[in-house]
C-alpha cells in the first residue's frame, strides 16, 4: 500500500490539480464572505453598471484621442530601444576601443539628428498652433485700407 507522500511524488500532476482546486475554492469562498452585499439603498442603478466605484457615467465613452499621444508613444518606444542599445554597449566600451567609440558617436549623432528632425517637424508640440498677431501700426496704411 502506498503512503500519501509516495502517491504525491509518483503523481505530481494530480497533486497540482488538487492544489489548484483548493486554492480556487478558498478564493471564491473568501470573495463570497468578504464581498459587498447589495441590500436596500445600496442596490440601485449605479451598482448594476460595470463602472468602477458605482459612479453613474456622464457623457459619451467615444472620445477622440489626439494624434500627439500616438506620436509621443512611438517616439518613446524608438528612443527606449535605442537607450537599450547604448546600455548594452556600455559594459564593453573599454574593450571596443576607438572603433567602437566612433560607432557609438555616429549612432548618437544619428539619434540627435532624428530628434532635431522630429522637433522641427512639430511632433513634440502640444496644442493648437499659435496664430501670428498682425501689428497694423507697423504694417502701414496699405494693410488697414480695407477696414
From Swiss-Prot:
Gene Ontology MF terms: NADH dehydrogenase (ubiquinone) activity; NADH:ubiquinone reductase (non-electrogenic) activity; quinone binding
Primary location class: membrane
Lipid bilayer topology: Multi-pass membrane protein
Listed GO CC annotations: NADH dehydrogenase complex; plasma membrane
Pfam families referenced in this protein's UniProt entry, alphabetically: Oxidored_q4
Keywords: Cell inner membrane, Cell membrane, Membrane, NAD, Quinone, Translocase, Transmembrane, Transmembrane helix, Transport, Ubiquinone
Membrane-spanning segments: 13-33, 70-90, 104-124
UniProt-listed InterPro entries: NAD(P)H_OxRDtase_bac/plastid, NADH_UbQ/plastoQ_OxRdtase_su3, NDAH_ubi_oxred_su3_sf
Reaction catalysis annotation: a quinone + NADH + 5 H(+)(in) = a quinol + NAD(+) + 4 H(+)(out)
Enzyme Commission code: 7.1.1.-
Enzyme class: translocase
Subcellular location: Cell inner membrane
PANTHER family on file: NADH-QUINONE OXIDOREDUCTASE SUBUNIT A, NADH-UBIQUINONE OXIDOREDUCTASE CHAIN 3
Record family assignment: Belongs to the complex I subunit 3 family.
Subunit: NDH-1 is composed of 14 different subunits. Subunits NuoA, H, J, K, L, M, N constitute the membrane sector of the complex.
Described function: NDH-1 shuttles electrons from NADH, via FMN and iron-sulfur (Fe-S) centers, to quinones in the respiratory chain. The immediate electron acceptor for the enzyme in this species is believed to be ubiquinone. Couples the redox reaction to proton translocation (for every two electrons transferred, four hydrogen ions are translocated across the cytoplasmic membrane), and thus conserves the redox energy in a proton gradient.
Official protein name in the record: NADH-quinone oxidoreductase subunit A
Organism of provenance: Gluconacetobacter diazotrophicus (strain ATCC 49037 / DSM 5601 / CCUG 37298 / CIP 103539 / LMG 7603 / PAl5)
